[in-house]
Amino acid sequence: MRHAKAGRKLNRTASHRKAMFANMAASLITHEQIVTTLPKAKEIRPIVEKLVTLGKRGDLHARRQAISQIRDAAVVSKLFDTIATRYATRNGGYLRIMKAGFRQGDNAAMAVIEFVDRDTYAKGAADKARVAAEEQAVAA
């Protein structure tokens, strides 16, 4: 019986899950919003919230703990410099999960996970061009 066993296996080995969550956390910190399946979003939320709390601590040991989990120094510096300062007064609840319908191919429940007060300009290059074009249209 599987009583009192926390966490989902997601049909992956432990090392695959660990690597996947590290990559998803790095993507979420970089883009501040990702689209994934609902179970993956529910699993990644506490991981990233603990990383933000590490960023708010801000000391060298916290930075080393974050690097050991994410393994990307640029992402960790963004976490400690911009995201941690943004949520300095907020005690937890840094992320929101919104349901986003079902995937076409396998009918999997999809979700959007994003930072609560996220930077809307932290998206990809194509979206930045679209936002710039909209701002020029409004200014004209």
UniProtKB/Swiss-Prot annotation:
Organism: Rhizobium etli (strain CIAT 652)
A UniProt-annotated Pfam family: Ribosomal_L17
One GO CC term, this protein: cytosolic large ribosomal subunit
The name this protein goes by in its record: Large ribosomal subunit protein bL17
One of the GO BP terms on file: translation
Subunit structure: Part of the 50S ribosomal subunit. Contacts protein L32.
Segments crossing the lipid bilayer: none
Lineage, opening ranks: Bacteria, Pseudomonadati, Pseudomonadota, Alphaproteobacteria, Hyphomicrobiales
Domain of life of the native organism: Bacteria
Stated family: Belongs to the bacterial ribosomal protein bL17 family.
